[in-house]
Structures are given as C-alpha cells and as structure tokens.
C-alpha cells in the first residue's frame, strides 16, 4: 500500500483526443439512443443535473422531449418535489389513463385551481368519485366570463352533446374525431364510466417531439434526487407514488456505508424503479454500489465547474480516468454508468462516452437555458442566469447539506464544497441540445461509430500535452463573431 501511494497517473478531458478511424457512417445517420436500464431508454445520452439552478419540472419536460432525462433536485419539500414529478408525468400522454376529474357540486374555484396547477385547459366532470360516470366537461371556454368563482361547476359546465369515444380508440382515430367536431379533449368511456382522455395537445406533441423519451404508457420519463437524510423514506415513497421513473441517490461520496445501506434499502423497497447511486470515482466504489443493488452508478468527484471539493478536501480523480476505471468495472456487471461533471464542450461529451460512459450529466452547459430555474440577472448589459453548486453555502442552507454529510451542522458551521456564480443566458434548451448532439454526431462520424455501444467499445484515444491542447483551440486570431457551440 505504501509503495503504491503515487503509482497512479490520471487524465481528464483536456489530456486526450479521439483518434479518427475509417468510417462508413454519416453523422446524421448515427444512433444516439442508450438503454440505461430495463425501464429507462433515452434517445440522446444526456441527463440534466439534479441541481436547484438546473432542473425542475420545466427543464425535465424539455429534456425528455428532446430524448434525454431531467433529475428533479431535492432542495425543496417532499410534497413539492412530488408535484414537480407529477407535472412532468402529466405534461404529455398518448392516452391519459387516469385523468383528473371533478364533480358537479365542486366549485369553479376548485376547477380553476386544478387547471392552473397542472396547466391544463379543461377537466372531465363525473357524477361522483366512486362511479365516475361522465356527466359533462369544463374547459377554459366555459370559464371565460365567470366573475363569481364560488358557483358550482354544474352551473357552467358543458353537458349537452358530449363527444366521447371507446377506451380502445387509437391516437389516429382520436385525431379524426377531434378535428371533425372541432374540440380539444376526447373523454374515453366504457358503459358511461370515465376511463381515459385524449387531447389534441398530446397528439400535437407526439408529432412535434418524435424523439421524446417516454415510459410504456406514453408519458415523459423523469428522474428525481433523494439523499440519505431523515426524510428519505417518505420522499422516495411520495416520488414513486407520483410516477417517478428513476431515483437518484445523490451524494458527494457514494462509496460510504450510509449510501450503500440506502441503496440496499431503496432497491428492496422499490425493485421496479431504476436506481442510480453516486458519486464515485473508482472501480471499487462502482463494484460495491452495483453489488448493493444500484442499476446505474454516477461517476465524478469534484470535476464540475462550480465544485471546489478537489481544492477544499484535496480529493478526486481526473474525470476521464475515473470514467474509464468505473466503466471497466461496470462492464463486468453488464450495467451502465453516468459521467457527471467537467464537460465544457460537445467534444468532452463524446470523450466521456468513448471512455465508457453510457450517458453524461450536464449542469453548467444547461444552467443558462430558458428552462432552468435559476434567476435571470443583467450584468454589464448582458443577460445571465444564476448557477451554483449544490455544495455552495446557499444551496446547503436550502437543504443540500446532507449531500455533503453535514446534515446535523448549523449553517454557520458548514464547510462548503462549491461556489455560486452566473452563466451566460443561452435561450431555449432545444437549441443547446441541437448543438451538443451535433458535435457528438460529428465525433461518431470521425471515429466510424454507428452507435454508442460501438463508440464505447471501439474508439481509441491519444494523449496530448499543453501544446496539443493549445493547438486544438482557435489560435493566432482574434475571434470577432461568437459561435453557438464554442466560447472560451
């Protein structure tokens, strides 16, 4: 042990390049899909980080529509986080099998509150909550000129000439019915009982976002972060009840007894849920988490742009080596890893995937998009969004202190492992994802990789020094026009 103390040399993204290879594939034809687990297939290998300035329901919806996955952060109350998950699951459905409904005796105020909370434009009305026989429908059109919201729904709902369809109606058949009758919602009934709902918006979204990552019921995929704190059991329970697809046990040091015990407990309690555990940086840690029951291991100790773990605690492994070491172990188990942190350009994404990652987790590259929950600021005439590490003082005071095993400390005693800052505003997420995946596609074309599995197994690296890195970036020129996929 003593003799091997300095034996290991590690590499990160700026130390390596992929070697071009003979290719018979064009970038537009490569396959970017990845099967992370039995129940979680993504159409692009990108996951938005579970950080309080990166991912809430708005980001998670946008990520899933692009084919990726969003992790709802846990710096909020249990019920609030479950609501965020439910917003994602209800944002898009092929067929809504358990639609919201109200009864005629409830108030218009209650209908308005429900429709506003879940951003829906109408709700079916049933005779009672047990029999659920359809008796009407209430839409924004019915509420347009209502001034007294205390009146009962029965006084304003549409009751006559209701258009319905049987439960086995396909989306194609539903679209024709909706267009014929110029309506937006089609209740599905069996013997008069409400059994489902199809909306024109859901049909339009299927057409607009054909690459969306969905579950077996046609709903968008969503993940949520949990920790190892006192509220973890109830938090996990509420998230599962809300329909979460992936639970992420998110800690700064995944190779610890508390995390391993939590993995065993969560997997035993919810065996049907895809379970991610991390963060780690070694093969040994990866092995222990997989043996404890994790489906996926998240890799990265301190590489993030807002993380100070490596300088505060002096601990970490440069990210390319960490990914490769953990992926080498993951191959023995037939399971996946997520490369989390340190990614600055699209070229770093493909390096992470070629080194063994099945997907990457992004924070800083997405924090500036419209869909992130970070506050918008104007600084020196430019627009920015707030971005902070979950180990920053602000994030720890809000609830992420358990991630760094400081749950029992008073705020004045916190030892932060992250900073708070701002990142340039980038506009819509889909534009950023388009550029990032364009770079990945280009890299796969250069390496002759038809899909991500081939990239992982066949791509080769060359090491480079500081001169090679300098040569890789634009040099001997003053940049006068900013590129959408390069800033330095």
UniProtKB/Swiss-Prot annotation:
Residues 468-488 are annotated as: Disordered. NAD(+) binds at residues 250, 300-302. It comes from Staphylococcus aureus (strain MW2). Mycophenolic acid (MPA) is a non-competitive inhibitor that prevents formation of the closed enzyme conformation by binding to the same site as the amobile flap. In contrast, mizoribine monophosphate (MZP) is a competitive inhibitor that induces the closed conformation. MPA is a potent inhibitor of mammalian IMPDHs but a poor inhibitor of the bacterial enzymes. MZP is a more potent inhibitor of bacterial IMPDH. Residues 95-153, 157-216 form the CBS domain. PANTHER family: INOSINE-5'-MONOPHOSPHATE DEHYDROGENASE, INOSINE-5-MONOPHOSPHATE DEHYDROGENASE RELATED. Catalyzes the conversion of inosine 5'-phosphate (IMP) to xanthosine 5'-phosphate (XMP), the first committed and rate-limiting step in the de novo synthesis of guanine nucleotides, and therefore plays an important role in the regulation of cell growth. K(+) binds at residues 302, 304, 307, 471-473. This is Inosine-5'-monophosphate dehydrogenase. GO terms for biological process: GMP biosynthetic process; GTP biosynthetic process. It catalyses: IMP + NAD(+) + H2O = XMP + NADH + H(+). HAMAP family: IMPDH. The active site is at residues 307, 403. Residues 475-488 have a biased composition (Polar residues). Keywords: CBS domain, GMP biosynthesis, Metal-binding, NAD, Oxidoreductase, Potassium, Purine biosynthesis, Repeat. Belongs to the IMPDH/GMPR family. The gene is guaB.
